[in-house]
Amino acid sequence: MTLPMYTIKKVLNNSVVICQHDTDPEVILLGKGIGFGKKAGDLVDPASVPEKVYQLTDKEEQSQYRELVKHVDEDFIAFMQEIVGFIETSTGKKVDQHIHIGLTDHLFFTMKRIEQGMEVTNPFLLETESLYPNEYSLAERIVDMIHERLDVLLPDAEIGFIALHIHSATTFKNVLEVNRHNQIIGQIVQTIESRLNVKMDRTSLDYKRLLRHLRYAVERVATGELVEAPQKIEKVLREEYPLCYSTAWELMGIMERELKRPVPRGEATYLTMHLQRLTSR
């Protein structure tokens, strides 16, 4: 998409300018060097900027970003714009522009905490790697980039958090919603281990399959998608594997309670099959 010429209202730094246009009373343009040597009243042609230019048009996001650049180093802002471009290029997807706020804010203040000697933990790290393998791999590369460019070594815990931001941005889902779904999955896993008296191997293929099923089950319930299963199969599972079947219904109760949406009966069949596979090992 070709961006039109804009008139600069204010230069926030060399990489961030507030502009206006006939069709956009106010827009924040982000791009390395876009504000260099510019002042209010100057015209800016995004096509003349070597690096990719991003737009923030949502008023709330504009307000959040203005506040963010008051506290974040200008070079870091420019570096994060490179990171966002790297994510788009690597995934071949457009990203939700909120990532400029969410990921920048998260990483900048995480590095501050690390400098102060504070520990960063992520109890859901293995699950995140299993649920979002592509995003996780990309997050590992971003952590390497940060180490190479900024000489800051982020802990492995951060790979998981960055992966969630990437997933949120590439699927246009609120990162809080993504985190909430992961918490529900974590609660379900704890319930499975308690009810079935098993300790699941977090590195096993069966566990990864279960996590993927739970992820899509939670997403289906959240969006109201129906899932059906033959009643004859459900009847056999109920009779042959009563503990797994009753546990499946308990898990559905967790989803219904946490998501405040009804869970289709068909989910019980597929959950029971996964649980039976776990207990038969």
Q: Which residues make up each language-model segment?
A:
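A cross-family "folded-core" feature that marks the main globular domain of proteins
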Residues: 2-281
